[in-house]
Each structure stands twice: as structure tokens, then as C-alpha cells.
Amino acid sequence: KIIDNRIIKTKHNPSVFPKVKRLGKNFYQYPYWNGDTFYSNGTPILFKKLLNWLENNVWIKYKIPNSRMKELCETFYHTKTNSRISLFLSDNPDYIFPKFINGKITPSLEKLFQQIPWKELFCGIPSFIHGDLQFQNILYNKKSKKFLLVDWRQDFAGSTKFGDLYYDLAKLYGGILMNYDHVIKDNFQYQHTGNKVIVSFKKWKNASEYKKILDDYINKNNFDKYKV
């Protein structure tokens, strides 16, 4: 079903995804596209162009009842997260949760979950989204000056047509604060001793500029930065 929904999703907005040429039960195939990830060739100027491209080509707004959007967001954010926590606890019964991270007191997992402003998160913005808008999933061809999105999420709580725009914005924000390309290349350090954890990672070049650009975009469009 994941593969099927991914293909269905591309048909809702084919210009931003590669065209799937071959489909199997557990795989799909599309032609090689000559481009590099945004992590590899991004610049602050290009990031502004990316946001403009996303706004005009990807984030197509949908009009649906508020109750329907609330239902989808609750399923995607709350129900799915709670399910993943339960699965983790079941698979790791002896795991010691840290009480200190980088020297700061950290509430228990249960308290953190309770502190999340769920009601605010359930008020999403219905829009077509990528669903996993990490910078390594954004390709750019310098010669043609075109963007292409890969490795898209198949659906948002079952919906292939739309999801919550805030989710894409949050993915971008997270990718600025922590460069996932560095994580993949093991450019980070993690030490877990007893109930204490120390984490350090390499910052992305121009991260502060990217953050300001995204902050300005969020404010300009009257989005809720707290929710992002």
C-alpha cells in the first residue's frame, strides 16, 4: 500500500516528482535525474528561490472541513506518535531514559508527551505536501535551474491529496537546526552514561542565514512559528 499510495500521490502533482517508469510489488523505478541535494549545493539565495518554488508549485491549498483536518492531524501527530512510543518501550524494556541532556534537566517521556500543545497542532493547514521535506530529498540542477523532490511520504494519515503544511515547514526547520547529511556521515558524537546524555554535532554552514530566511517566510505568511 505504501508503494501504491506513493504513485497515486505523484499523479496529484506530477511536475514536482520524478515520473515513475516501472512499478513492482515492493519497489518503483524512475529515470536518473541530474541534480544534487540542497545540502550539497544550497546557498541562502537558492533557499529563497526554493521557498518561492515550494509555495507556487508544491503547497497547493485545499478547502476541507475543519473537523476533517483536525481528525487527520490527530491521527498523524498524536495517535501515530503514541503508537511509536509504545512500540519503542515494548522493544526496549531495559532502556534508561536520560534525566539530563547536555547538562539540562529533561522531563520524562510521558511528561514531554503531555506538554505538547496538541490542540494547536490539530489545527493544521490543508495543503499538498511532500511529507518528508528533508534537504537531502530536494534536488537542484544548476544548469536547468530546476528543483525536483524525491522520497516523498506516501500519505498523511491516509490522505494522498493533502496533509498539513506545518509538517513540511517543520521538516525544513529541523533540517536547518540539525544537518541530517552530517548525521548520515556520522559527523556527530553521542554519549549515554546512566541517566545522562551528551550530544554534539557539526553545524551546517550558513545555518543561521537559512534560519532567518525561513523565520522571515513564516512571519510574512502569518504562520505560527511556535507550531513549526
Describe the residue ranges of each PLM region:
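Flexible, glycine- and charge-enriched loops at secondary-structure boundaries
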Residues: 1-3, 40-48, 162-166, 204-207
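Conserved NTP-binding catalytic cores of kinases and kinase-like/nucleotidyltransferase enzymes
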Residues: 1-26
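Amphipathic alpha-helical segments that form well-ordered structural scaffolds
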Residues: 5, 9, 53, 209-217
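Conserved kinase catalytic-core helix
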Residues: 6-14, 37-129
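Conserved short submotifs of the Hanks-type protein kinase catalytic core
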Residues: 27-36
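Active-site acidic catalytic loop and adjacent metal/ATP-binding pocket
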Residues: 113-163
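Active-site activation/catalytic loop segments of kinase-like enzymes and analogous catalytic loops
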Residues: 155-218
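All-alpha amphipathic helical-bundle segments outside canonical DNA-binding/catalytic cores
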Residues: 222-228
